[in-house]
């Protein structure tokens, strides 16, 4: 079986948020889809190991923030490669509350949809949470971030708990003639040809010439967490 066929499927990139008691948590997800229009019903796939999974079950609802294409990698890193068990993911984040009191991102978000959980489907490592939309609004005009754009243009990577993660797929196989370095935490690849313009690193800057305080654009790891590939 050629599993590369799965790579032809298209996805978006979203922040899924939920509430448990007086605490908020959220994560990046790419498997979000509309099921029906009357009533408007949406679904999201969440790994059972993730804290957000626990929060959705406890709060019986969730919010989807539709990310804009221009979203910084650092925001994706905060919600996609860090655990809410170890930190407050909303620290330093500009967010607002939906009608149901659930958080959504106020910046870099085209729209949000709040859903009341009405069904959970067991999908092995993941649960598919199905909910009826109870609140929604368009916040910005623009192009949504897609999974393909995130990987091909932003050079982003996939958390191991994502439904689309494939072992070995995140390793860059580029020849060593143009040395690239890969983050051992989140698999981000620093390419000297492209640099890191978002953080002031010009294209053509070798990894060795990066400032000592430079950190991974996605997860924030230091240079010592990178290995040549």
UniProtKB/Swiss-Prot annotation:
Pfam families for the chain: Flavin_Reduct, Rubredoxin
Gene: hrb
Subunit structure: Homodimer.
Domain Rubredoxin-like: 178-229
Expression induction: Constitutively expressed.
GO molecular function annotation: electron transfer activity; FMN binding; iron ion binding; oxidoreductase activity, acting on the CH-NH group of donors, NAD or NADP as acceptor
Protein name: High molecular weight rubredoxin
Family from the record: In the N-terminal section; belongs to the flavodoxin reductase family.
Residues bound to Fe cation: 183, 186, 216, 219
Role noted for this protein: Has nitric oxide reductase activity in combination with FprA; probably involved in nitrosative stress protection. Acts as an NADH:FprA oxidoreductase.
Protein keywords: Electron transport, Flavoprotein, FMN, Iron, Metal-binding, Oxidoreductase, Transport
